[in-house]
Amino acid sequence: MAKPNPEELVDLGMLSYDKQDFSKARKYFEKACGLNNGGGCGSLGMLYEYGQGVEKNLTKAAQFYSKACDLNNSVGCGSLGMLYEYGQGVEKNLTKAAYFYSKACKLGFQKTCEILKEK
């Protein structure tokens, strides 16, 4: 059997997510994240942030967003910035929030560029 393609795993996870099958989505995202796919890690963080298919856990969300950001996933960086801005799952730290918003903006996440302009 061919080695799973992380991008395909994320796509399968998103299809499951769209069908509200969060448990199945989580499995795909976990596999993709394990293969160092930033989109998989970021999507896994989202499931934990909102308690979809898993028990809500903002600390775990922050860990997955952090890994996603390390893998240059713009949404992971932006989401991590938001957790730092509001002290959710991590200790509130506006300096770190600005850093992650800035990294997300540089990676093309337009919403974070707008957040930075408002600060």
Regions found by a protein language model. Name each.
Residues 1, 23-28:
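Repeat-mediated protein-protein interaction surfaces in helical alpha-solenoids
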Residues 1-3, 12:
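Defense-system signaling and execution modules centered on TIR/cGAS-STING-like, death/scaffold domains
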Residues 2, 105-119:
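Terminal, low-structured helical/coil segments at or just beyond the last alpha-helical repeat
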Residues 4-5, 16-17, 21, 34-38, ...:
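Short helix-capping/linker turns of helical repeat alpha-solenoids
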Residues 9-18, 43-50, 79-86, 115-119:
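Hydrophobic face of amphipathic alpha-helices that form TPR/SEL1-like repeat modules
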Residues 32, 68, 104-105, 119:
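Alpha-helical solenoid scaffolds that mediate protein-protein interactions
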